[in-house]
Amino acid sequence: VTEAPITDLEPWQEPVRGGPSDPAAFRLSGRSQLKALRDGLLRAPANARLTGRRLTKIGRRSVTFTMPASPWLAGPKGVIHPGALVLLSDSALTGAVLTGLPPGVLFTTAELSMTFLAEMPSPGGELVARASVLHNDGRHGLAVAELRGADGEWLGFGTSRVFLQPPLDVSGLPRLGPPPPDPSWDLPDPWARPCRPSPTVVAPAATVGLEVLAQAAQGVQPRPPIDRLVGIRVTQVDRGEITFSMPASEWLTNELGMVSGGCLGLLAESATSAAGQSLARPGSGYRALDVKINFLAQVPPDGGAIIARGTAVHQGKLMVASTEVTHQGQLVAVATGSTVLGE
């Protein structure tokens, strides 16, 4: 990464790059849409420009997405945030379903589940998500994904279910033209810039517990890089309860121009695991084990706050939490997850 000028703005506050796909793409089959995205015939969505995630392989019923394990994806422990795997897996899982769809079919993600199989790696190299279709009956699609780190280590396993809509009449759509030219930017895309301050791996005693979360809410402690990348802030802290806020920014949008399920999942996972962090004893660690997110409504990029409230519902060595995600007063997602304490 080349040295770049420092900007006072957080990445999500800057003018957005990328954008939704040309509606003419719906004239193409899902597989052809994926090829157009891979080959640059469709412009990359904003969340891909933010994180560096990209489509690299298309199989008969499978896809592979990669994403740089950038320092910008580090969480409060200094390693890659587990929510980054949720963000990446959402792209791969929906892409796998898309491989078998005819022209004009839209779909929405109903549910995404992720199991984390190991402690997250330090920044460096690439994260890889390989997803394939398990089932598609024309009304529902089910896909499965495995996520690996730079050295091939297995980091996570995910599944997703989508609802398929009846095909639209695409005969009136224009033919797909070239994507709009990209403006000239003074800085590289956010994920490729130096991250200041750099993430550091810190001892559990310095990273867990209610007091540290309270310091984050008060602005006493620097926010981790991934929070600065997407705009997440801790707004309220209590023992076993945590509230995060994230702006419905254009930077978080997918190919359809809506805030992506992966970004909502990142926020939900953050609140779910932080509820466990608030219960951790001084000097002990914590590790997210899994998260399941049910998506209830789409979120437009209107700049309004997306609120995630995580609440511990069971405390022991294994902490279970639930999270409600709202936008403009509407419930848009619910999540449950477990966190092991003392690791």
What is the predicted role of each segment?
Residues 1-343:
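Terminal targeting signals and extreme-terminal segments of soluble enzymes
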